[in-house]
Amino acid sequence: MEAIMLQRKIQDTLAAWKNEPNHKPLIIKGCRQCGKTFSVLEFARENYAHVVYLNFFQNADYAAVFNGSLEVDHLIMMMSALLGPDAVFEPGKTIIILDEIQECPEARTALKFFQTDGRFDVIGTGSLLGVRGYGKEPRSVPVGYETVIDMYPLDFEEFLWANGILVMVVQLVQN
């Protein structure tokens, strides 16, 4: 039986981001369990030869990568040492996904350096970004060096798609 892919509107947003020349690292904010990780990983697997994935909530040790220098070559060396041979860094063909980035504020600060370096696409996801009182704030928010978008749970149209209602039927109902 063939698996059915969950269609989300954010896939179009991610494709537009990737196709934009000189795009900035992307931050996706949204509530827990709304599909950020699933959507980003699916997009990455379909559009990049190599996916480097760090989930700071699942493995707090990943934060050590960002404790020292935030120079991109140093970060690549640290990620390679931590992740082993599965972490392949090929300019233009590798995406770095920093999941639950709010757990590692310095990873967010590093986005500025990834932007100025330009060799790798970077997406960070977070569910508590900007929540006052959470207590984990970066030294420096990379203002102007990141693109921030919001993601929400399935809307009604996405729900219909997920339940096998054809796009054509949805369009007929809308009209």
Regions found by a protein language model. Give the residues of each.
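Phosphate-binding site recognition
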Residues: 1-175
